[in-house]
From Swiss-Prot:
Principal localisation: periplasm
Pathway(s) annotated for this protein in UniProt: Glycan metabolism; osmoregulated periplasmic glucan (OPG) biosynthesis
Record carries keyword Acetylation: no
Family that this chain belongs to: Belongs to the OpgD/OpgG family.
Taxonomic source organism: Escherichia coli O8 (strain IAI1)
Domain of life, source organism: Bacteria
Record-level GO cellular component terms: outer membrane-bounded periplasmic space
A GO molecular-function descriptor: catalytic activity
Pfam family of the protein (one): MdoG
Stretch forming the signal peptide: 1-22
Biological process (GO), any one: beta-glucan biosynthetic process
Name of the protein in its database record: Glucans biosynthesis protein G
Subcellular location: Periplasm
Keyword tags: Periplasm, Signal
Name of the gene encoding the protein in the UniProt record: mdoG
């Protein structure tokens, strides 16, 4: 009888322990808050020189053995693979698996990898550690696992949905971006990944962020699909005051496009991961800011309260706009951030950095709060990031949007029908949208336009575009001082009804 009681008690204790134990963001937050109260310890590299000094071509030879993917022997649709350290990925991160009853460290082993022609001493790498990880999921076909998430380097992560290829990146946090003091790059130093059940359609990842002046706890819930959505919860703590905090940062690349054509002959009409910043302001206004590759660092700030969303988008999916069979810019996703709750007063900020080639990410966008708490106090931000190729879904259906911005030499048609340049710059902006397409072509659509002190609008005309079933704005402007930037805004209206988002363009200096 006593034995039966003991067994019953043991079973009850096991059930109670299993049901009550659960890993959560609060467990990570305790570590982050504890770190914030201590001095920063820079990560130490344990990387042998053969890996630290290798070239990119050599690093590419180190491949994960797909047959050894983590969870390969489980029926879960998600699998994990890991990145080896090498080049500037020279600091290990800890990766843990969270099960229903415990947390287990996923240990590095060189047996996970094939090294190609890279010569190395096996004894020097046996305890090396991983540089990061990737998540695989049968997103495009049921019998094939495709990579959908990559977490590698600082606090960067890339995500794609069905039929997409990697393009822009998201980050956990940005600090002092574009400030003279220099940017600080926080890094995820440890991850906890929940083991999914066979029927799970989402994967939960926790991360501990650390940097000289900030720490943070993050929870990412990845929901793969045609649009892959990542639900993000973050708890951030400052060690010291910072000049600027970038929340939900997105990083992309813009080299050239029709608003800023390539200075050299190139068979590709456009080359970019994103071509504009879209903002849904707290007051309901939609704003579209075409991207530039300026000759000097450019920072644009859009002040508002409680933003409803922002993102770096790739508008225009026709292959003919890119003509690149290797890099398939037409398949790269847009990323849209939707805040949860009220974020208060602050700005959506856009940073554009000069670059000579497509290998450098030169575009950054993020939310920066006006007020930051004292060091040690907790900041909470919740939001989703949608990675999509369906830009129509990322905009209000009753509001027309900018399909494309083209830049040209301004001219005037002479009596002999020959066009004569007149010293102006012309911008041709096509607007389209589901509701706009329903309007009769004789609708008296006009434009509300404005320009900053450094320019003058010489002419502004709007006409129906029968090809797009939208309206085309042509605006000729004269710049007063080419060494300064020139700001322009335009929106289409019908009497007192606003029909479109606001086109907000900055002509870079020395263009």
């Amino acid at each position: 009888m006593m034995k039966m009681r003991w067994l019953s008690a043991a079973v009850m204790l096991t059930l109670y322990t299993s049901s009550s134990w659960a890993f959560s963001i609060d467990d990570v937050a305790k570590q982050a808050q504890s770190l914030a109260g201590k001095g920063y310890e820079a990560p130490k590299s344990n990387l042998p020189s053969v890996f630290r000094d290798m070239k990119y071509a050599d690093y590419q030879q180190i491949q994960f053995n797909h047959d050894k993917a983590y969870w390969n022997n489980l029926k879960t649709p998600f699998k994990l693979e890991f990145y080896h350290q090498g080049m500037y990925f020279d600091t290990p991160v800890k990766i843990n698996e969270v099960t229903a009853t415990a947390v287990k460290r996923i240990k590095y082993s060189p047996d996970y990898f094939t090294f190609g022609d890279v010569q190395h001493d096996k004894d020097t790498v046996k305890d090396l550690g991983f540089a990061g990880f990737k998540v695989l999921y049968p997103i495009n076909s049921k019998d094939k696992n495709d990579e959908i998430v990559s977490m590698l380097g600082a606090s960067y992560f890339r995500v794609i949905g069905a039929g997409q290829v990697y393009g822009l990146s998201a980050r956990g946090l940005a600090i002092d971006t574009a400030l003279p003091s220099g940017e600080e790059f926080p890094r995820f130093k440890e991850f906890w990944i929940e083991r999914p059940k066979p029927t799970d359609k989402r994967l939960t990842i926790y991360a501990l962020l650390d940097s000289p002046r900030a720490t943070g706890a993050y929870k990412f819930v990845v929901m793969p699909g045609r649009d892959t959505v990542v639900d993000v919860q973050s708890k951030i703590y400052l060690r010291e005051k910072v000049g600027k905090l970038g929340v939900a940062p997105l990083t992309s690349m813009f080299l050239f496009g029709p608003n800023q054509p390539s200075p050299a002959n190139n068979y590709r009409p456009e080359l970019h991961d994103s071509n504009g910043l879209s903002i849904h302001a707290g007051n309901g206004e939609w704003i579209w800011r075409p991207l530039n590759n300026p000759k000097h660092l450019a920072v644009s700030s859009f002040s508002m309260e409680n933003p409803q969303g922002f993102g770096l988008l790739q508008r225009g999916r026709d292959f003919s706009r890119f003509e690149d069979l290797d890099d398939r810019y037409d398949l790269r996703p847009s990323a849209w951030v939707t805040p949860k709750g009220e974020w208060g007063k602050g700005s959506v900020e856009l940073v554009e950095i000069p670059t000579n080639d497509e290998t450098n990410d030169n575009i950054v966008a993020y939310w920066t709060p006006d007020q930051l708490p004292e060091p040690g106090k907790e900041m909470n931000f919740k939001y989703t990031i949608t990675f999509s190729r369906d830009e129509d879904k990322l905009h209000a259906p009753d509001n027309a949007w900018v399909q494309q911005t083209r830049r040209s030499t301004g001219d005037v048609k002479q009596s002999n029908l020959i066009r004569q340049p007149d010293g102006t710059i012309a911008f041709v902006v096509d607007f389209t949208g589901a509701e706009m397409k329903k309007l009769p072509e004789d609708t008296p659509v006009t434009a509300q336009t404005s320009i900053g002190d450094n320019g003058e609008i010489v002419e502004s005309t709007v006409r129906y575009n029968p090809v797009t079933k939208g309206w085309r704005l042509v605006m000729r402007v004269k710049v007063k001082d080419a060494k300064k930037t020139t700001e322009m805004r335009a929106a289409l209206v019908n009497a007192d009804q606003t029909l479109s988002e606001t086109w907000s363009y900055q002509l870079p200096a020395n263009e």
